A protein has these predicted regions:
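Residue-level marker of structural boundaries
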Residues: 38, 70, 99-102
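The canonical Cys-X-X-Cys-His
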Residues: 34-42, 93
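C-terminal capping alpha-helices of c-type cytochrome domains
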Residues: 83-102
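Bacterial N-terminal signal peptides that target proteins for export
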Residues: 1-8
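Gly/Gly-Pro-rich "capping" loops immediately C-terminal to redox-active cysteine motifs
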Residues: 29, 43-73, 79-85
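Electrostatic cytochrome c docking/interface patches
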Residues: 13-33, 51, 62, 67, ...
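Residue-level hotspots at or immediately adjacent to binding/recognition sites across diverse folds
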Residues: 23, 42, 81, 96-98
Length: 102
């Protein structure tokens, strides 16, 4: 029984570390989203003719981003850009735009 205590403590530390790792730094997400400004405008407020992202549903934006990434949605550049992010990063970006005021 005594030898299981250090093992249990090590497992608990690993689990806690994984949970902390899952959190994304808000400044990092903002930095990722800044890459979208050329086409979608500052903070997702686009000029006419381009889709605005500010205030859009996180779920809908994420769905589109994942479709671009998988090549299921036609695009000029989005299919290339979205492949540079993990699904978790795309989810964080979609949430960031959802939180912006239109």
């Amino acid at each position: 029984m005594k030898s299981f205590v250090p093992l249990g403590m090590a497992l608990a530390a690993l689990c806690a570390g994984g949970a902390a790792h899952a959190q994304v730094d808000p400044l990092q997400v903002r930095s990722w989203a800044a890459g979208c400004t050329s086409c979608h405008g500052t903070n997702g407020r686009a000029q006419p003719g381009m889709p605005a992202l500010a205030g859009t549903s996180k779920e809908e934006t994420l769905k589109k981003l994942l479709e671009f990434k998988a090549g299921k949605r036609p695009a000029t550049i989005m299919h290339q850009l979205s492949k540079g992010y993990s699904d978790e990063q795309l989810s964080a970006i979609a949430a960031w735009f959802a939180a912006q005021k239109p």
